[in-house]
Amino acid sequence: MYLIFM
């Protein structure tokens, strides 16, 4: 779910 921060 780190893609949300990109």
From Swiss-Prot:
Superkingdom is Bacteria
Q: Which residues carry this modification: N-formylmethionine?
A: M1
Q: List the disulfide bonds.
A: none
The signal peptide annotation in the UniProt record is none
Instruction: Give the induction annotation.
Output: Induced by erythromycin.
State whether keyword Zinc applies: no
Q: Which UniProt keywords apply?
A: Formylation, Leader peptide, Transcription, Transcription regulation
Tell me if Isomerase is a UniProt keyword of this record: no
Q: What is the effect of changing I4A?
A: No longer induces msrD expression, reduced ribosome stalling
Summarizing the function annotation, the protein's role is: Leader peptide required for resistance to cladinose-containing macrolide antibiotics. In the presence of erythromycin (ERY) or azithromycin (AZI), binds antibiotic in the ribosomal polypeptide exit tunnel, inducing ribosomal stalling. The peptide inserts into a cavity in the tunnel, altering the positions of uracil-2584 and uracil-2485 of the 23S rRNA, which blocks recognition of the complex by release factors 1 and 2. The stalled ribosome inhibits formation of the downstream Rho-independent terminator, and thus promotes transcription of msrD.
Name of the molecule in the record = Leader peptide MsrDL
Q: What is the source species?
A: Streptococcus pneumoniae
Lineage of the species this protein comes from: Bacteria, Bacillati, Bacillota, Bacilli, Lactobacillales
